[in-house]
Amino acid sequence: MVSSKDKIKEELKQEEPEENVEIANTETQKIEMVEEAKSDEFVLPFQRENLKNYLWRLLIIKKVEIRDVILKNSNEPAQVSYIDGYVIDNNELEQRLIKEIVNNQTIPINLLKEVNNHKKEVYLFSTSQGVYYSLLRSVVPKLKNGAVIVGIALQQSDYPQPMVTLVHPSRLEELKTQYEALSKTKKG
């Protein structure tokens, strides 16, 4: 019995140094990250664009981040909305999609497949209060279920200039017509 205990102790002692050697090896090999380019084509790192660059377009939102900031010039608090998503790079397809949503309130599968082939990834930002409230009210609660499709529009507000907001795609044409009519009356 005593000899079997001694044998076990000896085996344990023999195993311990081997474990220390393995740990020592892993501690000397510290690699943070390795990434290799898939092709020789050049790609620029993304830069956030202003949401206003995509007025009167459809936007498929996949990620939203809202940050509280203090503006440098005025020391005023504000919210900056960071939006990651897609725009459709085919105007004809975008118009067909809007008509389909207006008429049926749904998007057929064949049209979805076409949209997936013509979507362009965009990284946007906005300081508009209209966008901030639109995100909180109608986009963020739905993001848990999947990507949300919205229209980027200008809407009349209490301020002298119209406010950028995110609206249901079916309202995009109506708001664009209203905005153009108001612009003509102000000029005329």
Curated annotation (Swiss-Prot):
Recorded superkingdom: Viruses
Compositional bias ranges of the Basic and acidic residues kind? 1-15
Task: For the region Disordered, give the residue spans.
Answer: 1-21
Write down what this protein is called. Answer: Uncharacterized protein 11
Q: Which organism is it from?
A: Sulfolobus islandicus filamentous virus (isolate Iceland/Hveragerdi) (SIFV)
Q: Its encoding gene is what?
A: SIFV0011
